[in-house]
Amino acid sequence: MLSTLATIAHAQGGPPFRTDDPDTPGNKHWEINFGWIGDRNPQRGAYQVPDFDFNYGLGDRIQLKYEIPIAIEETRAQPATPTQPAIPGQVIGGLGESLLGIKWRFYEHHPNTSWLKNDFGTGLLALFGHHAPPEPSDPEDLAASASEPATNFSISTYPQLYLDNPTRSVPRGVVAPGPNFFLPIEVNARIGPIRLDGEVGYNFGNHALPQSWGRGLLVGHEFTDRTEAYLELYDEQDANTLPAGQGIGQFATGGPKQRETTLGLGGRQTLNHSKTLNLLLMAGRSFQTITNTNSQPSWIAYVGVQVLLGPAEPVTPQVEQKLPNEGKR
């Protein structure tokens, strides 16, 4: 039996990682992530407790996203220095910003096929029950590809818009002033048993939020269809500076460019027989020197649960392939 791509594709980027990937939930499928997230350095910490992340598959290649956290910002007490007064510690919390996104996997390559044939598309025909048919092949090719993944290379784009909610989270310094637009490109590939995923994106910022680059790389392996682990390198760097007088708390402008570079280890573990409930774990820290004057984190972490919902996937019977001389005696 041949199932659709959505049932074969496995998670890679996305929660619990910062780097995303081209995979989508599948037509009319939900991927819902509940995560407890932390990022702490010697001066401050940022936490989402929890983060609610809702994703819906529109066709085989498009994903709609809405995300909103309960955010907590911690300022750690700092002693006075010859140039700076003492800073009292405080913890504030509130509703975080809303994140709206749409991911489009516009290119995917299947093993044993041309790199240009039938690889571009939207996948929206799946909404009407029309999935891309399997490529015709001879028996030897079918046998060789039986253990191959559905795709071995894909590319997507994932525009995302951050919006402030009608609360006092911005004036209290819980979240950065919005709106902010993030435009990334994601690429993933399989090389033997290794999975690779890369993402590069640009935050366009606003009058109170610097523009910045986000770059991520994931390298890992799927040990079984229930267990996968990855090593992640992620770098976020301001592209400009802003004059003082905008923002509140740690989002106040006027300082030097900031950069955060982290190395993390994480993965996913299926918790039930039907593979609809997954445990998400990731932990890491900066691999650069951590001081009181830079934003390099002493630790980052993600602990969460992923719920997968959706209709049963349609299947099509595999056409029996006869050998050239079969039936001749």
Outline where the language-model segments fall.
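Transmembrane beta-barrel domains of Gram-negative outer membranes and organellar outer membranes
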Residues: 11-206, 212-214, 218-329
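Sec/Tat signal peptide C-region and signal peptidase I cleavage site
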Residues: 5-11
